[in-house]
């Protein structure tokens, strides 16, 4: 019996039965197996709307309301590790557009908040805590941004978004997983 990894090259005009038989013999790549072995990943949604009580923000929230009094990313990671999580993904930016890192692309970020006098970086703290505790690290970067004035202008917004993604993927070392 032939097994397939990667892609399947179907014969010209195969029957549904042939497609099903071939698809049933697809086996995962090593990287896919490693991802499956993680078993549980934590997804942290912590943003400016943690302080508004809303699920989704409007993008008009003042960064001044983002002022956690005892944020301890190390404690988060220790608890998640004790619970069996092997990776944590954080919402670096949700639909409200508020960035948990001091991005150069917008003032709608931790750099404009009173938290740590605008010098805080939730992404850095969490990434460093993950490294210290042997946990994998990932980010979610919302494609929708209700704060960005260029949203809706595809070329301009694409440049804006790619710059944010580039910051996240170059400022923090290895990022194990990215969600959009």
Predicted regions and their residues:
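Mature catalytic domains of secreted/periplasmic carbohydrate-active enzymes
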Residues: 1-180
């Amino acid at each position: 019996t032939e097994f397939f990894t990667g892609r399947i090259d179907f014969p010209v005009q195969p029957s549904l039965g042939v497609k099903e038989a071939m698809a049933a013999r697809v086996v995962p790549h090593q990287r896919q197996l490693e991802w499956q072995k993680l078993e549980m990943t934590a997804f942290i949604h912590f943003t400016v709307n943690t302080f508004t009580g809303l699920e989704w923000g409007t993008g008009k929230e003042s960064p001044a309301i983002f002022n956690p009094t005892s944020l301890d990313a190390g404690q988060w990671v220790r608890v998640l590790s004790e619970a069996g999580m092997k990776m944590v993904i954080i919402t670096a930016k949700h639909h409200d557009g508020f960035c948990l890192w001091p991005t150069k692309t917008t003032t709608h970020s931790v750099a404009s908040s009173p938290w740590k006098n605008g010098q805080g970086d939730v992404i850095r703290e969490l990434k460093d805590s993950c490294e210290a505790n042997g946990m994998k690290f990932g980010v979610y970067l919302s494609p929708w941004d209700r704060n960005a004035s260029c949203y809706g202008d595809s070329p301009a917004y694409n440049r804006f978004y790619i710059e944010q993604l580039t910051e996240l993927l170059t400022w923090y070392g290895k990022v194990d997983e990215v969600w959009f």
